[in-house]
Amino acid sequence: MRNFSVFERFSKAFKDHPSLTRILVVSTISGGGLIAYSEANASYGANGGAVVETGTKKKKVVLLGTGWAGTSFLKNLNNSQYEVQIISPRNYFAFTPLLPSVTCGTVEARSVVEPIRNIGRKNVDTSYLEAECFKIDPASKKVYCRSKQGLSSNGKKEFSVDYDYLVIATGAQSNTFNIPGVEENCHFLKEVEDAQRIRKTVIDSFEKASLPELSDEERKRILHFVVVGGGPTGVEFAAELHDFVTEDLVSLYPRAKGSVRITLLEAADHILTMFDKRITEFAEEKFSRDGIDVKLGSMVTKVNEKDISAKTKGGEVSSIPYGMIVWSTGIGTRPVIKDFMKQIGQGNRRALATDEWLRVEGTDNIYALGDCATINQRKVMEDVSAIFSKADKDKSGTLTLKEFQEAMDDICVRYPQVELYLKSKRMRGIADLLKEAETDDVSKNNIELKIEEFKSALSQVDSQVKFLPATAQVAAQQGAYLAKCFDRMEECEKSPEGPIRMRGEGRHRFRPFRYRHLGQFAPLGGEQTAAQLPGDWVSIGHSSQWLWYSVYASKQVSWRTRVLVVSDWMRRFIFGRDSSSI
């Protein structure tokens, strides 16, 4: 037990962590706005956005999954005409960005979870089944499930559920790349249970290393923690573990002092490759100062019970003894999704292919979002002839500047990559785009654009078609978007509000999904965080850590979890992290 009193620890916390005062101020100031926001949403759900129920039979929506995508869909759905059946083996939502904090006791596991039955609009008829879907049958509109509790209500472990609409938000599983020994010997960090197991293993490692008869070599092996994967999750866990060891465990386990090592293996040339170069360089330098051994260009080839084999790009193979490995190298497809993909002719893909409205290609009334799906953004050049023909209203074979402008308005809505291309090239408008068409004088209003010039102007925009990252931010936006589509399904069936159909007549029912990147964080330990926000804005250091606290507190799905998470942060500042092995 520590020799500090509560008051001494409190004083030490404020002295060692001057940011604590600012965190309290930020939390207090932002609290009023968050309350107002929550109350505004509650009012909208009760009155402004409600749909008056008629005597018609409710459409049944089956929602598979209670992760970011599924929970966002459930929270934002506000139409009483639906009966929502939630099916998931997990009866709660987990705030996964804080899982690295759970592994080291910075935040408690129960603080980042919210029971799924507490989530959702009051006017929407919802029910939950704790079961795992193992088969989807699009022909009969059924999903087949296996109860987690052993038996279902009719005495059988397996049962089926009918649907009118199916929303697939099952997420993904950790990708082992079929490397021998990974499944048997590594810890993953995808679920709350994973974080709890890691935390217990860390404490058990220190307890084992404190035994008197242990050799120095064995003690060093037990206290060697290896992280595979230099993405945000792997980097944040390594940083959290370093803080846990240096701030709490070393003083509690004197035998362990000098024997603890943390190694980060990354197959690429740098860690945090999805971040700005400035963040990547700072993270690598900070880890070097902190004593975290970052091995770049190292690819794991095999994992044994007590050592891991890694190969460099030069072909050199080394054996690294370890006490615990955390595997954080990417995501793979769940078995139920693989089976479904084979049924609908998508067997060679890594994720379900959807269109821009999140509809699974080759199916009816089935939607997929989050990590289990990827959007197949249609390319402009696939429709360029049809676009030109529709824009050429007088059938003259050329487009006037006005016709081109009107066509571009529709194109920008239907094909998000056009707007991204204009921004990437820092183009101010249509005139800049026309310069690439090699027209004589783009300043003239009587310009006439032939189809070859039209194609030339749009030839490069498809270079901005990119797969969306598998992040909570993407999944949450997709869930909110799909909920709004469902809310307005009947209304938009009669009066479509989407872009003009380039092939065919009329309009699409809805505007296609468009992802808005709001920024990303990379906590690096020592009360320092790297933040990359839209507009090429990069901030690194203690100030970004305060922003991280504020944003992550505000993004909690309930006031219960928000209060618990902030309380855990305060507890850690004052009392330190809990080192008990429970």
From Swiss-Prot:
Documented EC number(s): 1.6.5.9
Chain positions recorded as NAD(+) binding sites: 223-259
Sequence ranges assigned to domain EF-hand in this UniProt record: 379-414
Catalytic activity: a quinone + NADH + H(+) = a quinol + NAD(+); a ubiquinone + NADH + H(+) = a ubiquinol + NAD(+)
Entry cofactors: FAD
Sites where the protein binds Ca(2+): D392, D394, S396, T398, E403
Gene3D superfamilies: 3.50.50.100
Transit peptide: 1-38
Localization (cell): Mitochondrion inner membrane; Peroxisome
Domain of life: Eukaryota
Factors inducing expression: Follows a circadian regulation; up-regulated in a diurnal manner. Accumulates in response to ammonium but repressed by nitrate. Induced by chloramphenicol (Chl), paraquat (Par), rotenone (Rot) and salicylic acid (SA).
Top enzyme class: oxidoreductase
Entry keyword Methyltransferase: no
GO molecular-function terms, A-Z: calcium ion binding; NADH:ubiquinone reductase (non-electrogenic) activity; oxidoreductase activity
Annotated residues for binding of FAD: 60-90
pH dependence as annotated: Optimum pH is 6.8 with NADPH as substrate and 6.8-7.8 with NADH as substrate.
Membrane topology of the entry: Peripheral membrane protein
Cofactor note as given: Binds 1 FAD per subunit.
Regulation: NADPH oxidase activity is stimulated by calcium ions.
SUPFAM superfamilies linked to this entry: EF-hand, FAD/NAD(P)-binding domain
Principal cellular location given in the protein's record: mitochondrion
Family designation: Belongs to the NADH dehydrogenase family.
PANTHER family: EXTERNAL NADH-UBIQUINONE OXIDOREDUCTASE 1, MITOCHONDRIAL-RELATED, NADH DEHYDROGENASE
Protein name: External alternative NAD(P)H-ubiquinone oxidoreductase B2, mitochondrial
Organism from which the protein derives: Arabidopsis thaliana
Species classification: Eukaryota, Viridiplantae, Streptophyta, Embryophyta, Tracheophyta
Gene: NDB2
